[in-house]
Amino acid sequence: MLWLLFFLVTAIHADLCRPDAENAFKVRLSIRTALGDKAYAWDANEEYLFKAMVAFSMRKVPNRETTEISHVLLCNVTQRVSFWFVVTDPSRNHTLPAVEVQSAIRMNRNRINNAFFLNDQTLEFLRIPSTLAPPTDPSVPIWIIIFGVIFCIVLVATMLLIISGIRQHRRKNKGPSEMEDSEDKCENVITIENGIPCDPLDMKGGHINDAFVTEDERLTPL
């Protein structure tokens, strides 16, 4: 009688869990690719851990808090570590909707990956899209970073204003001295008219240009 019951349960499970069955998901693991020489063998203990992680994930879904490890069925396990699994509802003898299983796996994807030391690329749920890892909190608060950036901008702007003011002040100081130098140069310039060197008229000191003084004026004192 017990053997008959065992075969009956096995037949039911085989009908529920099969490749491409309704609400079934295929899983593919690349343990050696991920861990290299530290790769572990996939055995019954690892299968039990996988079932436990799926049951743990399903318990977080509303109205699925009673999910047990025995409700998770695995089938078509290959040596290259790929298999199919379903989550059953023993009370109704059918599999849970794929949408619920998918939601549970996505919410706990990181926990499942960490349990096997894998990631989304080496532990693939082929019909369940990968999820992004939750954002990590920065060690420095964001407001401090923003304040630091603004402070640096204000500091640079202040330095530029100071440098610009110093340059303008220097230009103003150089202006009058350059004008005086140019006037002095103009006063000392000797022009040549008709081959005769002529001194410019000294307007400040009343200097008379000798080129325009007649011989009588030179000999006759004033």
UniProtKB/Swiss-Prot annotation:
Where does the protein principally reside? Answer: membrane
Q: Name one Pfam family in it.
A: Collectrin
Which PROSITE patterns does UniProt cross-reference here?
COLLECTRIN_LIKE
Residues carrying covalently attached carbohydrate according to the record: N76, N93
Q: Which GO BP terms sit in this record?
A: positive regulation of amino acid transport
Q: Enumerate the transmembrane spans.
A: 142-162
- All ranges on the Cytoplasmic side of the membrane: 163-222
Q: Which residues carry this modification: Phosphothreonine?
A: T214, T220
> Could you tell me what this protein is called?
Collectrin
Question: Which species is listed as the source?
Answer: Bos taurus
What is this organism's lineage?
Answer: Eukaryota, Metazoa, Chordata, Craniata, Vertebrata
